[in-house]
Amino acid sequence: PQGRYLYRARTSMNSALNGSKSHREWYIDCLKNYIFWALDEAKSRFGAIPDYVQYNVMYDLQGRFKVDEIPETVLTPHEKTIFLKMLFDAVFQIDDHIILEQKNLSMELKDYIMSIKKAPDSGTLQFDDKSEDAWFQYPDLSTGHASSYQLRLTSMELMKHDILLEGAAKIYLRFPYPANLFLRITTGHTTHMVKCCFREDPEHVFRFNGQKLAVFLKFTAVIPYEMFSGITHIEFCWDCDGHTICYHSLHRMSEFPLAYGQQKLLLN
């Protein structure tokens, strides 16, 4: 049998789950009295931890990985050390596929957990120049394909001689930092490269325990109309230590497309 959990998050951010993050009991007591009890009880009854118990436990644990930093008003430095040890002691008892199946756990957190679960800072960075991708390879699995991180398009403005395109690209900071972000524009047999201006978005930084794991890079690109003649294909890429990474996960924000005069541009 399979099960899934549906949680309705409140936009006001005052749900029981959000409130729990400001209480010591959610970090230590819950792990001690529920998580480890469930794991130990399963091993005692069945000799091993069934998948459904692991999934239930991991679903509960994933919220702890979404806390950017634990305030000292909630846990003392000593208590935080105890909590982190307990957290990973629990995760080490969860099978890899259960962790990777979590829908609400980000790609960077999944790789971060694996890099510690397998061995501290483990995982070998691999590049595939043919598919223009990179990932971290472990003895029995791979995680964090760079091409699958989210690319957002927020606006497109028609100017007199150019198109101004704006968006944001998510970067996992375990990869080498981008040397540049660029558009690859292909029309027929002709390809142009357009460099983007980019900077980190301070409002979209993803952390765990104070460590910065990923960021969104806000970018702008100016594309001359002369690059468009017939069917034109635009790819969003970045330079990762001399290797090209091409994004495959495109998300149009609600602001995109924008009306310009009597025209509206649509991204196919």
Regions found by a protein language model. Give the residues of each.
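Nucleotide-sugar-dependent glycosyltransferase catalytic core
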Residues: 2-34, 48, 67-80
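Active-site-proximal helix/loop capping residues that flank conserved catalytic or ligand/cofactor
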Residues: 5, 36, 58-59, 85
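Basic, ligand-binding patches in group-transfer machinery
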Residues: 57, 68-75, 83-268
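Amphipathic alpha-helices of TPR/Sel1-like and other helical repeat/solenoid scaffolds
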Residues: 30-44, 80-93
